Amino acid sequence: MSIIDNRKAFHDYFIEETYEAGLVLEGWEVKAIRAGRANIKEAYVILRGEELFILGMHISALQSASTHVETDPVRTRKLLMHAKEIAKLIGKVERAGFTLVPLDLHYAKGRIKATIGLAKGKKQYDKRESEKERDWERDKARLMRVKT
């Protein structure tokens, strides 16, 4: 079950592969995400050494958040993955020109996980072509519904 989706990623990129990664979060962030107060539309994943980090993910603190904790809504958050998976991603990102984008946040065994996609950027004409295809599929379904 998805908590937050990044539909813009599917519009802007061709998603080749998806991976699941854990997130290093603070307590107030977990509560805010459970309340649906997170945004990953402008977020992206970077590599620093042998580690993955997510930047641009905005988590708005709840009103009930502690006053003793300084809440930074757009801080850099570390992603947790197996070393072999990270090594494979590093190779593809550095050599093949791929980029990493967060696709959604979801629960897995009670923990909040992020699905990240190995993606290539779409050109403007690719976006138009995808839109035409979507429209044609919708029209085709409508025509089939009318005839039967």
UniProtKB/Swiss-Prot annotation:
A cellular-component GO term for this protein: cytosol
Keywords assigned: Cytoplasm, RNA-binding
Subcellular localization, as worded in the UniProt entry: Cytoplasm
Organism: Aromatoleum aromaticum (strain DSM 19018 / LMG 30748 / EbN1) (Azoarcus sp. (strain EbN1))
Gene Ontology molecular function terms on file: RNA binding
Function, in words: Required for rescue of stalled ribosomes mediated by trans-translation. Binds to transfer-messenger RNA (tmRNA), required for stable association of tmRNA with ribosomes. tmRNA and SmpB together mimic tRNA shape, replacing the anticodon stem-loop with SmpB. tmRNA is encoded by the ssrA gene; the 2 termini fold to resemble tRNA(Ala) and it encodes a 'tag peptide', a short internal open reading frame. During trans-translation Ala-aminoacylated tmRNA acts like a tRNA, entering the A-site of stalled ribosomes, displacing the stalled mRNA.
Family in the record: Belongs to the SmpB family.
Pfam family, one: SmpB
Protein name: SsrA-binding protein
PROSITE patterns, per the entry: SSRP (PS01317)
Keyword Cytoplasm: yes
Keyword RNA-binding included in the entry's annotation: yes
One of the GO BP terms on file: trans-translation
Compositionally biased spans, kind Basic and acidic residues: 127-142
Positions of the UniProt region annotated as Disordered: 127-148
NCBIfam families for the chain: PRK05422.1 (NF003843), smpB (TIGR00086)
